[in-house]
Design a protein with these regions (language model features):
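Structural transition elements
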Residues: 333-371, 389-394
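Extracellular/periplasmic solute-recognition and catalytic clefts
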Residues: 216-227, 244-302, 325-326, 334
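N-terminal lobe/hinge region of extracytoplasmic solute-binding protein
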Residues: 42-93, 206-209
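Surface-exposed binding/hinge segments that line
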Residues: 89, 99, 118, 125, ...
């Protein structure tokens, strides 16, 4: 990504400070607010957890943006603004100093201090916690050594200079660290509450957070309710007093609920009916690309998918243009690589064969399978697992039809709940599976966690030491152009190994009531906190 300053012979410090208006919701002049400021939002699945150490999904992250606050946060426009830290200084390529605000409080009234962040990050890395999402904390110095059991937790590169000053040393220069610090995984956790309640600390009645909302109710698979926190440092600027999240997996059901007034804000719309919904709802339909990728994860340790020829053949015959124009048809872009358009730090990947006529692609792919030992008499057969959702089902049916008609491949479809799929992928219990990645921060490194050797998010179980070597070299560069060139090379190298089957770049297409203020189309990372919204009189 583009760094905000250049290094001379001696590095000069950059201090970032912000006016209060930069991180408060702004109600335009002349707008009359509704008497009731209670909003209901759809999430596409039940959250796997409310514990920052165990949150992995879009749902979990979205809810956690309301219940917790990191050193920084992402505002309505997608910009990095102060959170618990009121300012930060980059004193060296690998060193950041964050000045914490003295009025930051936990929902139980205790002050939020630098020690709370250190405890939370060490907890993510502690094997006893069993976190599956350590990739963000791994940017902090010595984190990887701690995970490998080669260094103690106390060696983590985070130091409390005083209760309200946190010094962070990163493993490599990371200009994007303030973006990364906004993610729920990097949020502080209250040690007293975790110690007292153990695994039950996130239950209503036990829960203590430091975000603009506190947990009022949580009925798994039914609803989760957040109530405006009286102790939040910026509470006077938070307009919405209550947010209710309903986990509805079926987009058609969600749209009916929206029409009935049960939702103010949906996660998505049913696939393939964009024109119809646009005509019916007009400006209530919000659209925009996301820096996010929809793909099929292939277990590279599975006997079938150890062979690159098999993986490449499956990718080559999928008509992504047909998929995105006729089936999903919500503004998605065809993708052949992992990194999506708009990502800073690397270019997108498009193989030469993407421009071939489909007949030529099919012929080449059939020869790949033949050389791998498959034929009409001995067809390639495997199971594709996807989680419950209309879109995922439609895409799976499309892909299996393409593979069957063009390659003679037999694919068994397996549908499971999201939590089940998440565990199966991590445990290596699936052959091929539906997957997707929404960047945590706008930099190519957010994607590389999926393909680096031994990464906990590498469900593909793919490993190419050459890719890791190039990535490590790239992250030592202080010149943006050189870093981008190397990360692009690393991405191209990995994608030419076909560890997965990228399909398309997600679009953010959802219905938002006209009285919901604060929703913008420029938030490409789609991190939308309720505190940035307000309800207009209607």
């Amino acid at each position: 990504m583009k760094t905000p300053f250049a290094y001379a012979t001696a590095l000069s410090a950059l201090v970032l400070t912000f006016a209060s208006s930069a991180f408060a919701v702004t109600v335009p002049p002349g707008v009359t607010l509704a008497a009731s400021q209670e909003i209901t939002r759809q999430v596409p699945a039940e959250t796997e957890s409310l514990d920052p150490a165990h949150i992995e999904s879009w749902t979990g992250n979205t809810i956690a943006l309301d219940l917790f606050e990191g050193l920084t946060r992402i505002d309505a426009a997608g910009a990095v603004v102060p959170g618990v830290a009121q300012s930060w200084t980059r004193t060296a390529p690998d060193t950041w100093v964050f000045k914490l605000r003295h009025d930051a409080r936990w929902s139980n009234g205790q002050p939020v201090t630098a020690a709370d962040f250190i405890y939370a990050w060490q907890r993510v890395l502690d094997p006893k916690t069993g976190s599956k999402y350590t990739v963000l904390v791994e940017f902090v110095k010595n984190a990887k050594a701690i995970l490998a059991g080669k260094a103690p937790l106390s060696s983590l590169g985070a130091r409390a200079v005083d209760p309200y000053t946190l010094e962070v040393t990163t493993e490599v220069p990371a200009a994007f660290f303030p973006q990364l610090a906004a993610m729920p995984t990097m949020a502080p956790v209250n040690r007293d509450v975790v110690t007292r309640f153990g695994g039950e600390w996130t239950r209503p009645g036990n829960f203590v957070g430091n975000g603009p909302y506190t947990l009022a109710d949580w009925q798994p698979n039914n609803r989760l309710v957040g109530a405006k926190s009286k102790t939040y440092w910026n509470a006077s600027k938070v307009v919405i007093t209550k947010v209710t999240y309903l986990p509805i997996e079926n987009d058609e059901t969600a749209m009916r609920m929206y029409q009935a007034g049960q939702f103010d804000y949906t996660y998505s719309i049913p696939s393939g009916i964009y024109a119809q919904v646009s005509k019916q709802f007009g400006p209530e339909l919000k659209t925009g690309l996301q820096i996010a990728t929809y793909y099929y994860s292939l277990n590279n340790e599975d006997p079938l998918f150890k062979d690159k020829r098999v993986r490449q053949a499956l990718s080559m015959v999928l008509d992504r243009d047909l998929l995105t124009q006729r089936l999903t048809a919500d503004g998605e872009l065809p993708m052949y690589g992992l990194i999506s358009k708009g990502t800073q730090g690397a270019a997108v990947f498009k193989p030469d064969w993407a421009g071939w006529p489909m007949a030529k692609r099919v012929d080449y792919a059939r020869n790949l399978l033949k050389s791998a030992g498959y034929s009409d008499a001995k067809p390639l057969t495997f199971t594709l697992t996807y989680n419950t959702n209309d879109l995922h089902k439609k895409v799976a049916l499309f892909a299996t039809s393409e593979w069957r008609t063009k390659l003679g491949v037999t694919t068994k479809l397996e549908n499971v709940e999201y939590k089940v799929l998440l565990k199966q992928r991590h445990d290596g219990k699936v052959q091929a599976s539906r997957d997707g990645w929404f960047v945590d921060y706008n930099d190519a490194m957010s994607y590389f966690d999926l393909i680096r050797c031994n990464s906990v998010q590498n469900d593909q179980r793919y490993c190419n030491p050459q890719v890791d070597k190039i990535v490590d070299e790239a992250n030592q560069q202080l010149d943006d152009a050189e870093r981008t060139e190397l990360l692009t090379k690393a991405h191209d190298t990995a994608m030419n190994d076909y560890p997965m089957v990228p399909l398309f770049q997600y679009s953010a297409v959802r219905l938002v009531k006209p009285y919901v203020g604060g929703y913008t189309s420029s938030n490409y990372v789609d991190q939308r906190a309720t505190q940035d919204m307000y309800l207009i009189k209607h």
